[in-house]
Structures are given as structure tokens and as C-alpha cells.
Amino acid sequence: VGLEMCIRDRNGYRHASTDDIVREAAISKGLLFHYFENKLGVYAFVYDYSVRYLLLELSTAVDAKETDLFILMQQVETGKMHAMCGYPYLQPFLNRAQAENVNEALVAVEERKQQMEEAYENIYARADLGKYAAAEDVVKLRKMMELTIKGLMNERILEDAFQPEMLYEEILEYLQLSRRLAERSGQPSDEEITEK
């Protein structure tokens, strides 16, 4: 499964080769197709497994009573990190699958994709944005953090010795910076203070 994620992450569904998978896994193509029938079957299985595994990690990492946005984001990243400790290419694979444009692949994973999106929506829906003056800005800040995290992940994956724990530590630094920016945006600027 981890090998398949790695290959699919690098190549996407369209360009992923079953020849590469069987060569790297040291299994026969017959055995691969015995269990999965075709490339789409392998892709759907790996996607399904990845989402279920990630959701399990999120369910243990995210406190159901937490309402602080930045703590929720940290807990989500903790769950992702735990998942990537088992399967280093899990999150990059899921990120790449989000951008997939092959119709048959999209249809094959649509239900699980929806389940994952709903899980994230449920987590972030309970975030209390009321303590920030500009809640819309905090939503944009969260989107900016998601893109930053994906970018960091893409950079670190290219390194030969990818370590999810080191990526996690770097992500926490960015989350702390974002918290400070959001909290600062809720306070009046120097200009607003002098005008009063």
C-alpha cells in the first residue's frame, strides 16, 4: 500500500504504471491483477484504505470538544503526522488525488472523498471564530495555512530522508505564527488608537 501511494503520488492515476508497482513490490503482475482486476481497482483500494486510515488517526488526535481553531489545526496535523509515520506518502497521495482529473478515477473514489471532506468540515465547523475581529480573515488564513502545509510537504517529500516528525515540527512553527497574526488582527492598529 505504501509503495502504491508513493508511485501514485509521483505520477498520478493517468501516468501510474502497474509495471512500476510490480517491479518495486517484487510481485507478479498476475498476483496484482488477481486481487485488483485492473489499475483502477488498485487505485480505488489504496484511496479507500488511505482515507479510512487517516480518518482513524484524526478520530484519535482531534478532541471532539475543542473549539479553538488553531488547536484544531494542530490536532489535525498531529493526526496526519501519525498517519504518515505508518505510510509516509499517504497525505501526498491524498493531496494528489484531490487534483486528479481522470473521470474514471474520480468516480471510483467519490464516496470516500466526500467522507473525508465531511470529516474536515465537521472538525472545523466547531471552531469559535468569535474571538477574532475579522472572522473572514481567519478563514482566509486557514486556507493560506493549508496551501503552505501542502507546499512544505511537497518540498520535504523530495528529500531522500523524509521524516514526518520533522515536517510536523515545521508546520507547528507556521501554525504558531498564524495564531499570532490572527490574534494581532483582532486588536486595534496604532492608527486606530491615535484616532480615538
Regions found by a protein language model. Name each.
Residues 10-41, 45:
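Helix-turn-helix
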Residues 91-96, 106, 127-175, 185-196:
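Hydrophobic/aromatic-rich alpha-helical bundle segments in the mid-to-C-terminal region
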Residues 36, 42-62:
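Histidine- and aromatic-rich ligand-binding microenvironments
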Residues 2-6:
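Short, small-residue-biased leader/transition segments that mark boundaries at the very start
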Residues 36, 95-102:
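Short helix-capping/turn signature of helix-turn-helix
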Residues 52-60, 67, 71, 82, ...:
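Amphipathic alpha-helical packing segments from all-alpha helical-bundle domains
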Residues 11-14, 65, 87:
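Short coil/turn segments at alpha/beta junctions that flank glycine-rich nucleotide-binding fingerprints
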